[in-house]
Amino acid sequence: MGPLPAPSCTQRITWKGLLLTASLLNFWNPPTTAEVTIEAQPPKVSEGKDVLLLVHNLPQNLPGYFWYKGEMTDLYHYIISYIVDGKIIIYGPAYSGRETVYSNASLLIQNVTRKDAGTYTLHIIKRGDETREEIRHFTFTLYLETPKPYISSSNLNPREAMEAVRLICDPETLDASYLWWMNGQSLPVTHRLQLSKTNRTLYLFGVTKYIAGPYECEIRNPVSASRSDPVTLNLLPKLPIPYITINNLNPRENKDVLAFTCEPKSENYTYIWWLNGQSLPVSPGVKRPIENRILILPSVTRNETGPYQCEIRDRYGGLRSNPVILNVLYGPDLPRIYPSFTYYRSGENLDLSCFTESNPPAEYFWTINGKFQQSGQKLFIPQITRNHSGLYACSVHNSATGKEISKSMTVKVSGPCHGDLTESQS
């Protein structure tokens, strides 16, 4: 059935120009006549086409009827209405400019879009006596013909048994259900396959050859169904997880030679080294990729502790090892004494501190005029006298590196006048 002609000599006004009042609204219990029904013509409608919501068995002597988008009959969802007396058409806030209402209550929607799919409510008013109006609602769900779906993937080339893949059935379609097929059959029950709540997304965990596909998805609603083209995952060969072996995890700064080795060994892989997240250049002496498997550092400093990583690569990609951090042994550096230059008078307190850079932490000890005074970073002598004048030295020692170094200063304690302080280094 084609579109009906629009009613002649109709008045068209907006919903803002009409105020409807009713003293009493009761639901109408219709007599035992044929039930009002609504059908879509054509039953399958494609996007961009027209569809007529054709009303059957409409009661006679109706003063008017209203169409709403959705199941709620409020102002926000109000599309259009037809008032029989005066043949008045009223447009509501939900009117898009593509809807036409006819005198038999049928609704034509032109140039249908995806947003037009869903439930429509026909609200009819039946004349009662002078004190009441009888109202009834009829709902109808408009389904658009489902589009041909396609499968999008987060990764069409996963590593076998190592990587997860997300398959999505597109486009997202309202009022439709999603089905998935693998090898032409419904999905097998396995912990490696998991569907989202809407079934639109399929998650594959640790893809193996047994679940590589082909996969198809289907979009279905009550009037149509469409299935995608098949998609098969291209499994890449599994890469072993690399790891680093090293000849010395506790090298001495600027002394020990380090040799890092990336395992496992294979002629099929290229080896790349990383320091602090930056790739290290390949030595000019490396003639074959396999030779870059070993990284030689003639010496290492305290600023090169790492992390170090190695990566094995094939033509499809790579995989990095866990990081390795060195414990570089260094120091002690030349110590510093604070305060380094000061004057003392008899009766004052002498309070000196000694600092150095060292790994592991250095041992500290103090001497005065070559005689051992005490251990520790601080030296405190209360109420010094002239007898405390002399050569003060802080010595530091690192048992791991075997290195020892000292710093000395000469302190002169005077009476009423300031003493002289000079520094010397040994």
Curated annotation (Swiss-Prot):
GO cellular component terms listed in the entry, alphabetical order = extracellular region; transforming growth factor beta ligand-receptor complex
GO term, biological process aspect, one: negative regulation of cytokine production involved in inflammatory response
Q: Which residues are connected by disulfide bridges in this protein?
A: C169-C217, C262-C310, C354-C394
One Pfam family here = Ig_2
Ig-like C2-type domain location, by residue?
147-234, 242-326, 335-410
Function, as annotated:
Binds to the small latent transforming growth factor-beta complex, consisting of the N-terminal TGFB1 latency-associated peptide (LAP) and the mature form of TGFB1, thereby leading to the activation of TGFB1. The activation of TGFB1 leads to stimulation of naive CD4(+) T-cells to increase FoxP3 expression and to an increase in the number of FoxP3(+) regulatory T-cells. Induces the differentiation of a suppressive CD4(+)LAP(+)FoxP3(-) T-cell subset. Induces the secretion of TGFB1 in macrophages, but not in activated CD4(+) T-cells.
Q: Where in the cell is it found?
A: Secreted
* Motif placement: Cell attachment site: 127-129
Keywords on record: Disulfide bond, Glycoprotein, Immunoglobulin domain, Repeat, Secreted, Signal
Q: Name one GO molecular function term.
A: protein-containing complex binding
Assembly behavior: Interacts with latency-associated peptide; leading to TGFB1 activation.
Q: Which family does it belong to?
A: Belongs to the immunoglobulin superfamily. CEA family.
Q: Which SMART domains match?
A: IG, IGc2
**Where are the annotated glycans?**
N104, N111, N199, N268, N303, N387
Q: Does the keyword Transmembrane apply?
A: no
Q: Which residues form the Ig-like V-type domain?
A: 35-144
Signal peptide stretch: 1-34
Predominant place of localization:
secreted
Name this protein carries in UniProt: Pregnancy-specific beta-1-glycoprotein 9
